[in-house]
Amino acid sequence: GYIQIIHGMEEHKERYEAFAEQLWQAGFTVVTSDMRGHGEHAPKLGFFKEKDGDRYLLSDQVQITAYIRERFQTEKVMIFAHSMGTIIARNLLCTQSHSYAKVVLSGFPNYPGTQIIRIGFFLTNLLTRARGPMYHSKLVQQLSVGNFNKQVKHAKTEADWICSDEQVVQAYLKDPYCGHGFSVSAFHDLYMLTT
């Protein structure tokens, strides 16, 4: 089978190398990519597009699926998506469900609620007009992901929520392509995908 991996927020495809290797050993062909604003080739980490970045994130994955189908002459593409990747996968399924044989959603984020999303839209729109779409707001970052660590008892770092394995957390913290934050326009795009 053929598996398309869609990674999570503020990380990159290389974090999935060991997992992809296990899938390959099990007989799967795996295609990974960095989402816009992620990974070593991103022009600006945490930034997708000045406008409609959400649409581009979806379009990119549709193009990757088309590439897999054409390159490997298959109709049976499976998705493995993690965290923010599951939000993208869920959106793809709303319009492209016929394109995927199976979908695995790992670490699907909790919906923050309509009120939080409305506040997020208000803040990101205001800050985009005042500071520009590439501006990074500590307030928006805190409102969007700041509570993730509250579920971890005796947290030692701000990223303990990502994994119970301390070595994985330390590797994440040391990785220059992880935990870089999102621009206000990227958070706006994320809210668009969540609604």
Regions found by a protein language model. Give the residues of each.
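Glycine-rich nucleophile elbow surrounding the catalytic serine of serine-hydrolase chemistry
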Residues: 81-91
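Alpha/beta-hydrolase active-site loop
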Residues: 50-70
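Active-site nucleophile elbow and catalytic-triad environment of alpha/beta-hydrolase enzymes
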Residues: 182-195
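Alpha/beta-hydrolase fold nucleophile elbow
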Residues: 72-83
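Active-site glycine-rich loops that stabilize anionic/oxyanionic intermediates
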Residues: 3-11, 84
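Alpha/beta-hydrolase-fold enzymes
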Residues: 89-177
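Conserved alpha/beta-hydrolase
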Residues: 15-45
